[in-house]
Amino acid sequence: MSALYDNEAKIRQAVGMLQKIVNDTSVPRNIRRAATDAIRNLQDQTLSPAVRAANAIGILEEISQDPNMPMHTRIAIWNVVSMLETVKD
């Protein structure tokens, strides 16, 4: 049960970090949209935490190579991906 709580805490923290990206108007719209999609995946309670994290990682890794992304946003996305990679069932 403790692992599930830890996973949910990591997911909540990742959602919070992604929410900052979504609310940052200096970030291009397509990147904010991808962050919103990742949040939506992370909040889908019908899936296990690891599957939700993997889905979000896929979205974020795809967008992380965008040349228009500000450097601070890229670093934030890498931090979120690193955190989500530790989520396991």
Swiss-Prot record:
Signal peptide bounds: none
Highest taxon of source: Archaea
SUPFAM superfamilies: Ta0600-like (SSF158436)
NCBIfam families in UniProt: PRK04330.1
Family (UniProt): Belongs to the UPF0147 family.
Classification via HAMAP family: UPF0147 (MF_00342)
UniProt-recorded name of the protein: UPF0147 protein Saci_0891
Organism: Sulfolobus acidocaldarius (strain ATCC 33909 / DSM 639 / JCM 8929 / NBRC 15157 / NCIMB 11770)
